[in-house]
């Protein structure tokens, strides 16, 4: 027997049933996708789909060459034909904006876009953190005021309500100011942290030289006291940034959305400015962040487009659904409405015709394949979870009848005229 080939570590199959080490099912995932589709439409967002492979330079320019994502986590390879450096996308915003700039999508009006799909990072796999993971992203492009900042947070809170997990999530916010304000804060922060360089861990020493703001994001408990006493970016904000942040918070207050101000919230990507935020939970262990985002007013220009202030966020689907599966609610309709079975010569073809007719009327029908006994077929019907069983036997072919069985026992088994099949099932379903 040939040796089995296993999936790549940290990249999961999505099956119709739960797995030992990955509890999410394809049906649960599909129900979430359907919910997201309806949710985005209610806010006027249009879907965009981009390739999973991009030129590496896109992420170097947008995310930042010195970030952990670009420096350590991307899957990068060379195209064999022209040695062009390519990478599997580690996040969705850069790809979305590349497409917007390339196709001149902002030429006459702002845009509200959303995407959903797989991302890739070379990380140590653990619960809620995978090498292939999936995100839903929201991007509001060409909007400058704090009103859009508040709207997309209200939008995310609305989704948490729909999924039944609002009470398990906490909103943290901060302002990163503009480029000049961050530069002034960076100088003060470097001066402060340099005094404690001998106490920093190796990762923080590296960040001190490449992206000192990320030192404040450390999870090392030995560095918390140092970081808590560090210069705060909020103290370097100018009047315009302060006003934007104050109006943003006032809108959240007016919407009744509770939040915590976290001056150490910086996000992991270099393109953020002004408003940043995260939705966190204490129900998933170390992987506390379920959703995060912020403003990236200079990124479209950085990628070759005309200046367009913008804001967006992304949520990790795996983490989110782990939370929903344990604490929330999501209606999953994986079972068919009808399990169609047959017995005797000629009944197999006729049951196909009935099944097709029912599907045309909106019923989900699973048709039995093979020629087992009626008892065995009925067992499969029961295992399928179908609400109704349709039985076509040879002796019913001549007189044009079928047998219907309500698997929940709400109706007695009946033999009905084939012409009344759809109406009878519809009445039973609506009863």
Curated annotation (Swiss-Prot):
Pfam families: HGTP_anticodon, tRNA-synt_His. It comes from the Bacteria. Its main location: cytoplasm. The keyword Phosphoprotein does not apply. GO terms for biological process: histidyl-tRNA aminoacylation. It is an enzyme of class 6 (ligase). GO terms for molecular function: ATP binding; histidine-tRNA ligase activity. This is Histidine--tRNA ligase. It comes from Neisseria meningitidis serogroup A / serotype 4A (strain DSM 15465 / Z2491).
